[in-house]
Structure formats: C-alpha cells, structure tokens
C-alpha cells in the first residue's frame, strides 16, 4: 500500500535524488549543515521558511554562480541521510531562488566537477540517471501490480534476494542497467522475479578450461541432464561430436556472444555450436548475473556485458580461480580448523568454473563461476537474507523489513524497541567483528564483506545467528600469511592473483567491512528511528577496541584511530564514465578519504554541540576581584554584538571576519550545527567581553596538518575589550581551559595561532602550551602548540584546585 502522495515515477525520482545527494556529500567537501532561518539573507529566508525542516544542507557552488539548499529529514552519523523536497538553487548574482530537479542538480554537479576533476562526461551520466529512474519506476509498477511485499518477517533466500528494489543506497544511478531493453528488464531482473531457461553451447573440449574442486566436471553433469531434452537435430549434432562439452550461458549474454567476431569464427570452424534454450527455469539473484533454481545443485554466476551501476559485470579469469582455490583450501585441515574456530561465518564458495579460449585468449563473456547452492529442498525456505536488502528503507511509506523484525521481536519479548535494537546489533557485532578479525590474523583470509556479498541467517526470535559470505571475486590472502596458505596449497595464488600486500589491506578492508557493512547496519537502524546512531557507533568502537592487542595486521588500529578512511567514490567514478570491470585499468574506481565515524566515540557534546544557552561555568578570581563566566553562543541574541566585535580594528588583522552581517551570519549558521566547532560568549563581571571557539581537529581542517588524536580539542580565543585594565585576557583564557579540561573526553588542547599573533603566543606560553612546530595553512602560517592538563595545572596550580573543587 502506497501511503505517499507520489506517483511511482515521482517516488523513483525521490529515491534516486536521495542517493545522488548522499553520494555528493560523501565525495565533495563544499557543503555544510545550515541551521535555522536567516535574518540577513532575505531571499533564502523567504524560501526555506516554506520547507518542512529547520536544518538544511547548503552546497557552495559559488564557483559556478549559485548555492543550493536541501531540507534534511534525518541527518546520519554514518553519512547516509534522508531528505525532503524541494531542493532550492539560488543564483548569487541576482538572489533569484528556484526549485531544481534531479537532472538540474546532476548538471550542476558535473559543471562544478569540471573545475576539480578531469574527463567529466555529463551527457553519459545524465542518460544513466534517466535509465535508473525509468528502471526503478518499472520495478515499483511491478511491485504494485503484483501486490508484492518486501518487508515480511520471514523470507526465503530467493525472496530476500529479489527484494532489493531500491538498489545501492550510495550510488548516484542505483538502478541503471545499460544494455537491457524493456523486455530484457522484465525478464532478467531480480526485482521482477524473471524466469528463463539457460542457453547452451556445444564447444570443442580443446577450447574449454574447466575445474571443479568438488569432483566431476560440471559440463559432464550438465551433459547428462540436458542431452535427453535436446531436439532431434541437436541430438544428432552432439552424437557427431561426442567429445564436445556443453556450456551454459545467460540467454542475454548468449545473444551478445553470438555477434562477436571470435565466436562467429568459432562457429564457422565448427569449434562451437549454439544449441539454444533448454532445461529448467532459473531466476536472477540480486546481482542480476547470478542465477538460481531451487532444483539445481549449482548457482551460475555469468559474465554479463550490461553496465549495471558502474561496471559491465564481467568475470575476469583470475577471479574464477579464487573460488576454486578457497574451495580446495576449505577441504584441508586449514579450512576445517578455520570453520571450527569461527562457526559464525559460513562461506558459500564457487568450487567450479568454466572458461572458453580461442587463439590462446580467454573470451571473458564465457567465464562462468559456479557456486554451491545450499538453498535446495527444505533449505530453500531458510530465513536467510541479503544484508543490503535487510538494510533497505521502507517502500511507499511502509515500515522497512528490519523495522518490522525488531518491532515484532520487541513485542514478543515484552521489551522496548530500543533495547531489542541494541541487543540485536550487539549480536550482529558478536558474529561479525571478532570472527572476521580473527580469520584475517590467524588464517590470513580477507573477504570483501560488503552488504551485497553478505547474507544473514536470522534465528526464530529474529536475531542474527550466522553470516554467509559469497562471491569468488572477494577472496584474498594477506602477504603475512602467504607462506602458510602456500604450504597448505602450493601455487595457490599463481592464477588467482589473490595475495594482497599488508599496506593496502587495512584501508580497503575497512571500506568493505566497516563503512559499507557494519555502519550500513547502523545507518539502517538509525534511519528507522530504532536507536540513536551514537550509541551504536560506540558499540562498534568498543568491539574493535577489544581486539586492538590481538591484531597484528594494523586493521584494528586503522579502524579505531585514523582520522580518515579510504572510501569508494561512486559519483566521481560515474561522472568520469569509468568501467570498474576494465581489466586494463590498475585502479578502475575512484577512492578518496572521508572522516572516520568511530572518532565520534570521543566527541564532546558539551564543547561542540551544547544543548543549553545558559552559563555553564563560572570562576571568581579573588586577587583581581573579578568573576568570569561562559555560556554557549545564542545566534538570536548575540549575533549583532559579535558582528560588531569582529569589525573592531584590533580584530580585523587576525580574525579576518569583518564584513557584512549576511556573510557572518552564514558562517555561524553553518558552524553551529557542525561537528567542527562551536562558539561561547565570556562575561567579565556580567559584561560580555570575550568569545572562545572550541574545535575538534578530527573534523576541523587543522587536524590534517599534524597527527591528530580523537581526544584532541583546540580553541580560538578573542577578547573584544581593548582597555588594558579591563581585558583580563589571562584569566578569561584560564576559564576557557578550566572548562575544556574538566571534560573527561578531552586529552590535550591544541593551538594554531598565527606566528604574527605575538600577544596570544605570550599568553598561551604562560598557560602551559608548548610549541611543537610551524604549520603552513591556506590562510596563515601558524605555530602548532599543545597543552596537557598536567602542563596547564603546573603553570596554573590554582586551576588544579579549582578542578578538584568542581
């Protein structure tokens, strides 16, 4: 039932728009949160007053003459947000504000990107965007027409596989399939539960490469199964070429292959014969190219020359060997011990493969990876679900499947939804984090544990019971355990190219396991209002922190301590029209650094996101007979005062924040909701006289200029008073440091005052700051200084006593 007042086409556009905006926010930095309705920007005030939210995303497109405002329905700690419409664009020269649709927004992105990246292909990405929207509309129509539910409490393997209607939530063209026409789309898409027979070729055995770690060649099995079904002409042909092998193929790919020059030559030379469609009907899993039948012992993962999202889905020859290698390994004592040590993880392996060569060259279109099918007979109804589908948003305003499962479990157990959510997530971390880190360390096995490769088996209560990993492409071995696995299976990586160097392991593994997988679950729970994401992030941090001393690979250190993580840029990859399956490219996708969400474990709400506007700390200095107090900045009451302060002559050279009220208001409305910094007003004997701005180097630009820790905090300090006997600068700065150091999450306080700010340098030296070096920042040359609690208290022992009294 559709509870939204949107057509399927409009809903498809909104889903794609949400994905596109989220991709932009992940891959570009010219955006900020924007809080409230401005007083000095009339054009924006008049328009955002009409939107349903007080928080917007502002994108600074000033280099192309505009800015954009997007209403935020839910802002996520993990980086995938929910938005309302409309999106507004303001022409800066005229202040004209108008709505911008998804195509207009993509055009702006492409225009802006040309100033940063090379080879931007706007026309192609716009076509793919339109294709994605049209395809999603088709899938939504099918959902409605067939009254198909995708949020049932229990779903079979194939039902769950075919429930991922909305697609990749962090891809700008999530349902793009270039190569399928409308008939193909309905017939071969998992979203429409398409059914089709496979196409079969008869091929000279000298041109077939085949392996099966489980025993008999699959072509032999298929021959015995398909031969009785052949028509008389094809039986006669096979009887003539009795040693030829039967090779299955996805019917769409078969049509593609039959018009390729090499294949046509093979036909002319009698090396290959096209038999056509035979046998049982298969249906696609979520990947489109892997097909399933409940009556088949195998699932077939075909090459498919259809560009799905960013790549033509081609099996490369070395990848075929990875499935075969891991299947062999799991049969050894190495594999038996691994499965005994970590029963929480099960591997759906591809023990067999078929490839076809011609003139000593493998034809990639024929590459088939063949997977064991554990979902046959009674097991076909197992409550096993693709993680990406489980994390999918609700459709048409209905609850998501994850929400239904947790709410139902809470009802059955008579517990709060939040408690069940936390318990559910703890159980997921239990079967995920320690086993995966342990397998990597002890056995050297690394897997691309992203949401599309992971399935979760749920127990009768709805809690995670087991993880299934699939995809032969995603098996690797770290360099540090190469000797171990090579001793077990000599020559294991010769064909599969599956050894990964230790240096690149942590960044890539973090992207698959944490960014995509674990934090994807956090995001789904948060977006469904089931739990506070901060609580879930804390659980993730603790789960990895517990393993810090057990991990020798550097993975855990990277996950919990790095300021930024290595992340895939699907939008930039799409804008540059890169085919990720291009084997000629060393790095076929674009990767970039993004902030580490686990740093939020050390985030100080009291410094950066205070909830009060009242006095938070006061101190009386008896010797000077002065009382100094501080409170968080209130933009409605303090703005005009601080604007006047920043326009005083002594402030201009160092602060450089003088200018129109509209510009300063924009700055405040973007920093106040940010994770970077906040502003406090200081009083001397009840007279507002100074400001200080605590900031967090994990999000502030300064953190990129030194080896920042998540417990580091800094502050900017400004005294508005110029009369010497009224300034009390030293005492005021003490109050700021007293407050900062009373918070247990703070480790040390850093400074980066300009080398020209001599008075500031004198004060902070007296307060216990030590100079660590000089840093060259875009807007200044600065001294990097550190101040610890002990260093501060040593210089100002009365502050230690003050802290004890608090």
Where are these regions (language model features)?
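A short, well-structured alpha-helix characteristic of acyl/acetyltransferase catalytic modules
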Residues: 608-625, 633-655
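Conserved GNAT-fold acetyl-CoA-binding loop/helix
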Residues: 650-667
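Glycine-rich phosphate/pyrophosphate-binding loop shared by adenosine-nucleotide-utilizing enzymes
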Residues: 300, 626-628, 687-691
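Short, flexible loop/turn elements at secondary-structure junctions
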Residues: 304-308, 453-460, 471-474, 634, ...
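Acyl-donor (CoA/ACP) binding surface of acyl/acetyltransferases
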Residues: 616-621, 633, 638-639, 686-806
